[in-house]
Curated annotation (Swiss-Prot):
InterPro entries linked: Protamine_P1
Principal subcellular localisation of the protein: nucleus
MF terms (GO), sorted A to Z: DNA binding
Gene: PRM1
Listed name of the protein: Sperm protamine P1
Function of the protein: Protamines substitute for histones in the chromatin of sperm during the haploid phase of spermatogenesis. They compact sperm DNA into a highly condensed, stable and inactive complex.
Chain positions covered by the region annotation Disordered: 1-62
């Protein structure tokens, strides 16, 4: 009985953690995407650095 209870609590905690992590990552990604689009447009006009290279570096990190 003790063994069953332990495994059950373990699986439940893992599921909860995974769910929370996933939602947080999704929200952060969406916010980052919107901010990046606005910033890249403004930066391209002001500075003359290549946007393609910058985006590639960011993508690799994610």
């Amino acid at each position: 009985m003790a063994r069953y209870r332990h495994s059950r609590s373990r699986s439940r905690s893992r599921y909860r953690r995974r769910r929370r992590r996933r939602s947080r990552y999704r929200s952060r990604r969406r916010r980052y995407r919107g901010r990046r689009r606005r910033r890249s447009r403004r930066g391209r006009r002001r500075r003359g650095y290549s946007c393609r290279r910058y985006s590639r570096r960011r993508r690799r990190r994610y």
